[in-house]
Amino acid sequence: MKNHIKYLFGSCMLAFCCLAMSAGEVVSEGLHFETNESAGTASTTWAIFPLIRTGAPACASTYPSEFSKCYYERSDNYVNLGALSVPEVVNHCAVTAIGRYSFHNSGITSLVLGKNVTTIGEGAFIWNDSLSAITFPEGLTTIGDEAFRYCKSLTEVNLPASVQELGYGSFANCSKLERFTTSSGLKTIHSSAFELCEKLTTLNIGESVEAIDGGAFIACDALSTINIDPANTHFTFANGNLVNTDSKKLVFVAHNVEKCIIPEGVKEIANCAIFYNPSITSLVIPASVENYEITAIAHCDNLTEVHCRATEPTVFSELNSKMWEEVASHCTLYVPKGSLARYQAAPIWKNFAAIKEEVLSTVDDITATPRPADSNVYTIDGRLVKQNASSLSDLPPGIYIHQGQKVTQ
């Protein structure tokens, strides 16, 4: 009798939802779609049958969908879809988009998207912590904000060539993700895209990537290898420093670097570039740095010394008034000889526990601590000149950094 009542309740709720649908809304294979027949397109909105099957209300009032008359339940046991395949066509309309929060916390274990999908909306697959495999269609262009956040079973992601943009937090908190390869067409990686991907060790950046926002790799403690396509002229990665060469901006410092030497020529330090970095103990800032974005350097508990090469202290905006607040109390600031009084009087800078002068030499004070296995050769300003080098004999005379040591050729 109880089962009959449950079935009757589910049938009634399904009927209610179907009555609530507009003419452009259809249900196919347990998935709810919004169709635009004049344009010949459709997008998923949410899953309906699994809600009834698991006993959750089909039209609960706790969380609205994109459509005013339909709602879905936000709970720890939302649905249990398992293997999900989104169809290519429904009701003669090509499925081109996955709507916002369509499959939020839906118990998906594997995902195959139909070949017509071009856009994955905000939060579309967030909190599917059993999702371990994704097949992306070749025509996909956009992955929205937090689309795969908290998909904790993903270990590797390879994007198709068509993807152009990774939204804010798109793969954040994917705690088992180890390797990520950007598509050959990817242009932009937004802030927090890989935040708290604690096991991410390797990132392969393709030729087309033009912009990486500050904070894209917050708390990626294992990220030590960023391979940049030789044809990419927008970024360099050397000695743990990821630099946008177009804007002269430091984007990220790897968390396996103890002594960070920001390359000469960098003009700006991006938001969260050196952020929650437990390894860094010493930081060298070249005189070329003119601007620090908000929270550019923060929460570095083991940072004990900062060497600032600029003779004039940088003036911080009101928005950046808390710069150095997290580290000043336990840090010594070293400044060029003759500039001590200026730093002691300068707002923000004067908050350091101790400020000392030092005499700068041209080369002798330059050292580096890249990742232990680094066999690449760099110039003293951080430019990569030779990869996987066993010898420097074919390089022109000069001073280089090889395997963490200064070498004169």
PLM-predicted stretches and their roles:
Residues 360-409:
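C-terminal outer-membrane/trafficking sorting elements
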Residues 345-362:
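A recurrent domain-boundary module in secreted/ectodomain proteins
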Residues 10-20:
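Bacterial N-terminal signal peptides
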Residues 1-12:
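Bacterial N-terminal signal peptides that target proteins for export
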Residues 42-78, 82-84:
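A short, structured beta-strand/loop element
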Residues 49, 79-96, 106-119, 129-142, ...:
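Structural signature of tandem-repeat unit edges
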Residues 20-28:
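Boundary at the C-terminal end of the N-terminal hydrophobic targeting segment
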Residues 99-102, 121-124, 144-147, 167-170, ...:
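Consensus positions within tandem repeat domains that build extended binding/scaffold surfaces
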